[in-house]
Amino acid sequence: MAELGAGGDGHRGGDGAVRSETAPDSYKVQDKKNASSRPASAISGQNNNHSGNKPDPPPVLRVDDRQRLARERREEREKQLAAREIVWLEREERARQHYEKHLEERKKRLEEQRQKEERRRAAVEEKRRQRLEEDKERHEAVVRRTMERSQKPKQKHNRWSWGGSLHGSPSIHSADPDRRSVSTMNLSKYVDPVISKRLSSSSATLLNSPDRARRLQLSPWESSVVNRLLTPTHSFLARSKSTAALSGEAASCSPIIMPYKAAHSRNSMDRPKLFVTPPEGSSRRRIIHGTASYKKERERENVLFLTSGTRRAVSPSNPKARQPARSRLWLPSKSLPHLPGTPRPTSSLPPGSVKAAPAQVRPPSPGNIRPVKREVKVEPEKKDPEKEPQKVANEPSLKGRAPLVKVEEATVEERTPAEPEVGPAAPAMAPAPASAPAPASAPAPAPVPTPAMVSAPSSTVNASASVKTSAGTTDPEEATRLLAEKRRLAREQREKEERERREQEELERQKREELAQRVAEERTTRREEESRRLEAEQAREKEEQLQRQAEERALREREEAERAQRQKEEEARVREEAERVRQEREKHFQREEQERLERKKRLEEIMKRTRRTEATDKKTSDQRNGDIAKGALTGGTEVSALPCTTNAPGNGKPVGSPHVVTSHQSKVTVESTPDLEKQPNENGVSVQNENFEEIINLPIGSKPSRLDVTNSESPEIPLNPILAFDDEGTLGPLPQVDGVQTQQTAEVI
């Protein structure tokens, strides 16, 4: 058995943890096995009740140890799985926190970028609003200054104006429609120098003011505002038409002067209407207001013309301002050619009057001297003022503004044909109702910026033609032809300027559109870049997330494979351990069986020696029949007591020991019965008292007597049954064999 323990320990030496855990239990099992298989010499002095203290069978303890080890391994594996699960959960929690942190950072970054864009957009809007406010304030200041400057010279000119009494006639209101028409031809026929002076008063003074150079440097929008200020309104055109009709019938050179209050109210009503509205809708609203008040203005002006008194005002002379103009006007007049078809008026005038004519013309009003650049409307506007809103609405390229053109006065060379007729104009003023001094007749050849868009030379020619017609000294057809020629030139100039202005506006509009398109393209490009960047970032994050998930999935699969591999290895190790235990058990059983057979052989040898000694003792003794019977009876009683002693400590197996004892003692009884039968049956006391005492003291010695009795009673029972040794794989007979061995040893001793 020591070899078994050593072999078991050597076999378990390669298991590591299993060996360390099961070492104490294996030592206990080994001690129990050693205690159960000690040699017979170690327990020779023990009593018969020694069999009651035998340990439990080793295989039962081995099964408990296996169950306990399996339970411990199972608990250890559960602990490892729980720890691994905790590690997985912690790793997933860290990954989730990292992903949430990444999302928070990205969201914060996008929010900061959006706020930055909002702040930048708000700053741009604020700058734009401030710039618009500054432009608006500057424009309002320019308009205010322009209105102030346009009103001051008008008041001053009203003081310079002079006029005579009008010949009121009832035919003013009943004039034919041709004379009330607004067309250029009809107005040009009845133009009077006084009307020319009135029409050119504000514009000529304003455009010839000292700060003209500074105002010409304004922006295009400001220039358009100033040009609209200088554009004549419908009421102005109505007044001009009425004045032309009156001057044609009365043939008077006296200017008609509107009272200051009426002029001031007209300016205060008309001009704010031009600038309160935005630039795009200003012309349309102005035209609507002007059309609505057209008839009222005509009637009021006619009444004023009829009720105004004849006044005379001396035009103040400013030598510093008029000296260059006089030089421009009169220096070229010495070599001027006469108009074709116009006779030289020399016979009807005395030489003194001819010489006095230049002196009378010398002090002209400021509108006669300087070439005036005037902003007026196009000819089609003047033909039908009622249809003006429709025409303005059909011109989207001008953005609702009325077409404005600039008419420059002709230079000194263009005015040369009308200069020789200034002299004859002086005597024609003698029949006037209000006599005027010689210097006062000079304002007659004033430039006429009338609604017919004629220049100063044309008005001068028309005025002189009308005077000569009354005097019978000038051909009106020639004057009309010259006027038409100058109107044609002026119209061509206007058309040219209009084309240039439209081209300039078109260029500006294209520039604005290109700028807006470029800004929109830049904004679109920025948005596309931002969207592409966001898409790329999202794609990158998605790819990273997919890669991370793939890595985690691969890690989980690898861990699952490792766990399955470890589980398989554990199961294989358990199977190997079970196989090893089974082999050890088989080896153990084989060794026990071998030892049992050896003990059986030793017992047989002992029994043979015992039978030989008994046979020799019986042969030498002389016995009697009564003693033998008595001894047999005594032996039977002792034999009957023997099974009680042997069956009591049998641990619930009382059947096995009698069979074993019987099997071991069968040969003894078989061999001893012939000797007993051969003994002489004699009366008296037997000689074998000492041997009988020995048999009484040793219970094993009484077995042959009991067997003899049983054999004599039932001869059918075989004397040597071998059934007890056929089942060599059972564990039950092993303790009984040990009990038999101890009894036989005691018998031998």
UniProtKB/Swiss-Prot annotation:
<protein>
    <recommendedName>
        <fullName>Ensconsin</fullName>
    </recommendedName>
</protein>
<feature type="cross-link" description="Glycyl lysine isopeptide (Lys-Gly) (interchain with G-Cter in SUMO2)">
    <location>
        <position position="273"/>
    </location>
</feature>
<dbReference type="GO" id="GO:0016323">
    <property type="term" value="C:basolateral plasma membrane"/>
</dbReference>
<keyword id="KW-0832">Ubl conjugation</keyword>
<feature type="region of interest" description="Disordered">
    <location>
        <begin position="702"/>
        <end position="723"/>
    </location>
</feature>
<comment type="subunit">
    <text>Interacts with TRPV4.</text>
</comment>
<keyword id="KW-1003">Cell membrane</keyword>
<feature type="compositionally biased region" description="Basic and acidic residues">
    <location>
        <begin position="406"/>
        <end position="418"/>
    </location>
</feature>
<feature type="compositionally biased region" description="Basic and acidic residues">
    <location>
        <begin position="372"/>
        <end position="390"/>
    </location>
</feature>
<feature type="modified residue" description="Phosphothreonine">
    <location>
        <position position="231"/>
    </location>
</feature>
<feature type="coiled-coil region">
    <location>
        <begin position="89"/>
        <end position="152"/>
    </location>
</feature>
<dbReference type="GO" id="GO:0015630">
    <property type="term" value="C:microtubule cytoskeleton"/>
</dbReference>
<dbReference type="GO" id="GO:0005875">
    <property type="term" value="C:microtubule associated complex"/>
</dbReference>
<feature type="compositionally biased region" description="Polar residues">
    <location>
        <begin position="660"/>
        <end position="672"/>
    </location>
</feature>
<feature type="modified residue" description="Phosphothreonine">
    <location>
        <position position="673"/>
    </location>
</feature>
<feature type="compositionally biased region" description="Polar residues">
    <location>
        <begin position="461"/>
        <end position="473"/>
    </location>
</feature>
<feature type="modified residue" description="Phosphoserine">
    <location>
        <position position="219"/>
    </location>
</feature>
<dbReference type="GO" id="GO:0005874">
    <property type="term" value="C:microtubule"/>
</dbReference>
<feature type="coiled-coil region">
    <location>
        <begin position="477"/>
        <end position="612"/>
    </location>
</feature>
<dbReference type="InterPro" id="IPR008604">
    <property type="entry name" value="MAP7_fam"/>
</dbReference>
<feature type="modified residue" description="Phosphoserine">
    <location>
        <position position="209"/>
    </location>
</feature>
<feature type="modified residue" description="Phosphoserine">
    <location>
        <position position="254"/>
    </location>
</feature>
<dbReference type="InterPro" id="IPR051483">
    <property type="entry name" value="MAP7_domain-containing"/>
</dbReference>
<feature type="region of interest" description="Disordered">
    <location>
        <begin position="1"/>
        <end position="91"/>
    </location>
</feature>
<feature type="cross-link" description="Glycyl lysine isopeptide (Lys-Gly) (interchain with G-Cter in SUMO2)">
    <location>
        <position position="295"/>
    </location>
</feature>
<feature type="compositionally biased region" description="Pro residues">
    <location>
        <begin position="434"/>
        <end position="450"/>
    </location>
</feature>
<feature type="modified residue" description="N-acetylalanine">
    <location>
        <position position="2"/>
    </location>
</feature>
<feature type="modified residue" description="Phosphoserine">
    <location>
        <position position="183"/>
    </location>
</feature>
<dbReference type="GO" id="GO:0005829">
    <property type="term" value="C:cytosol"/>
</dbReference>
<keyword id="KW-0007">Acetylation</keyword>
<feature type="modified residue" description="Phosphoserine">
    <location>
        <position position="335"/>
    </location>
</feature>
<feature type="modified residue" description="Phosphothreonine">
    <location>
        <position position="277"/>
    </location>
</feature>
<dbReference type="GO" id="GO:0072659">
    <property type="term" value="P:protein localization to plasma membrane"/>
</dbReference>
<feature type="compositionally biased region" description="Polar residues">
    <location>
        <begin position="307"/>
        <end position="320"/>
    </location>
</feature>
<feature type="compositionally biased region" description="Basic and acidic residues">
    <location>
        <begin position="62"/>
        <end position="91"/>
    </location>
</feature>
<feature type="cross-link" description="Glycyl lysine isopeptide (Lys-Gly) (interchain with G-Cter in SUMO2)">
    <location>
        <position position="406"/>
    </location>
</feature>
<feature type="modified residue" description="Phosphoserine">
    <location>
        <position position="365"/>
    </location>
</feature>
<feature type="compositionally biased region" description="Low complexity">
    <location>
        <begin position="424"/>
        <end position="433"/>
    </location>
</feature>
<comment type="similarity">
    <text>Belongs to the MAP7 family.</text>
</comment>
<feature type="modified residue" description="Phosphoserine">
    <location>
        <position position="161"/>
    </location>
</feature>
<feature type="modified residue" description="Phosphoserine">
    <location>
        <position position="165"/>
    </location>
</feature>
<feature type="modified residue" description="Phosphoserine">
    <location>
        <position position="282"/>
    </location>
</feature>
